[in-house]
Each structure stands twice: as structure tokens, then as C-alpha cells.
Amino acid sequence: MIPPFEEIDIKSLLPQQPPFVMVDALLDYSEEKTVTALKVQEENIFCNNSTLSASGMMENIAQTCAARLGYINKYILKNNRILVGYIGAINNLTILREPRVGEIIVTTVQVLEQIMGMTLIQGTIKAGDEVLAEGTMKIAIAE
């Protein structure tokens, strides 16, 4: 049986481990869409001048993809494999604003296409209703 999202330890879905974890919670999963949350903390390795850097925002999107894959493997395929993914390309990334320490960001990854171990996604980061960043990313999965 699949537990409710709030009972899932997101670190159990990721290959990354602290201090490199850039997602706090899995909020939603479907075949096409995954949603995570992160509270921006001052001690985050990607924080500079009390904001999460663009690099941290890109890693947050990539780790939302990793959480999606971990969820599929653990709860749907039930094989408990944690696969490593690599950012193959980032396109049309627009950073409108870097999130500030204390803000909770919600990241949505929409799967656009999957083929031969590559996944093309559209990622969007919001703080409340405000879009902070959006763009597409290709993720390659190492087998």
C-alpha cells in the first residue's frame, strides 16, 4: 500500500543526501506531474546573501525529477532502486526572482517526453502564487 505523501521521507527517494538535499517534501505525484516543497534555509549550501541561488533552483528542479523516479521505483515498481540522474541540458530557463531565506518554494515538474533513458520536463518554481523560475530540462538516467 502506498502511504500518504506527508508520511513519505523524501530522502528515501533520492540519491542525494544532506547537505545536498534540495527538496523537503513530496506534495503530489502522477504519471505526468510531480510536486515538491522546500523551505529555504540560511545554511543551505546554495544560499548566498539570504537567497537561494540560480544553481540551487536548478538543482531543486532536478531533485524534484529524482523524487519522481524514486517514488516510481519504490511505490509503483516496488524495486526500491535509487537511480542517479544527470542534467543533460537546460533550456529556456527564466529566473524571475531568487527565493529568500524563510520562503517555502513549491516546484512542479511536468513530464513532456520520455525516450531511451532521457526525460524532458518543464519545471516551475513558485512561492505562493508568484512564479520564480521556469524552464525545460533533459535528465539522463544512469542504469
Predicted regions and their residues:
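Hydrophobic beta-strand-centered segment that forms part of the acyl-chain substrate-binding groove
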Residues: 2-4, 69-106
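Short aromatic-glycine motifs in intrinsically disordered, low-complexity regions
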Residues: 7-17, 78-82
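Short coil-to-beta-strand transition motifs
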Residues: 16-22, 101-106
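Catalytic strand-loop segment that frames the active site of acyl-thioester-processing enzymes
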Residues: 18-53
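Hydrophobic residues on conserved beta-strands that form the core of alpha/beta folds
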Residues: 23-24, 90, 120, 134
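Conserved positions in beta-strands of structured domains
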Residues: 24-27, 91, 96, 110-112, ...
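HotDog/MaoC-like acyl-thioester-processing domains
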Residues: 35, 67, 100-103, 110-143
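Active-site helix/loop of acyl-thioester processing domains in fatty-acid/polyketide metabolism
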Residues: 53-78
